[in-house]
Amino acid sequence: PSLVGSEMCIRDSHATALEQKGDGYVVASLGEESGYVPYTAFSAKKSYLEAHPDTVQAFVNALQRGMEKVSQSTPEEIAKMIALQFPETDEAVLTAIVRRYVEQDTWKTDLIFSEDAFVLLQDILEEGGELTNRVAYEELVNTEFAKKALER
């Protein structure tokens, strides 16, 4: 964590734990302020997509079903589903984090990586000094499988 005066920038689990103990409170969320930025992305070579479209589609369909399950569940249910991934985080803290994410509309309900989100991601990477040359959306992003997953 970074401490600046009486403010600090820390992970949600730590911020929520402090908040629940009455030792602090969350005043802003980077996720809420930034807009939709993909936290996780999957990549494959074009040759793999062409050689194994059924495998790729099955994988994307499973991810889409997971996103639908999350969007149809309560924060308490989601916290129980993901608890094994966060063994160091108390279930009440995890539920509070999930509730905040739900209230902020942090999670999309589909896997389509929009051009706006792609531009925003490149803006962030460029401002952070991690990107020197931008790439065209059409050159790097394939939404074909995500769109088909929504049709099933």
Regions found by a protein language model. Name each.
Residues V119-R152:
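Conserved C-terminal helix/tail region of periplasmic/extracytoplasmic solute-binding proteins
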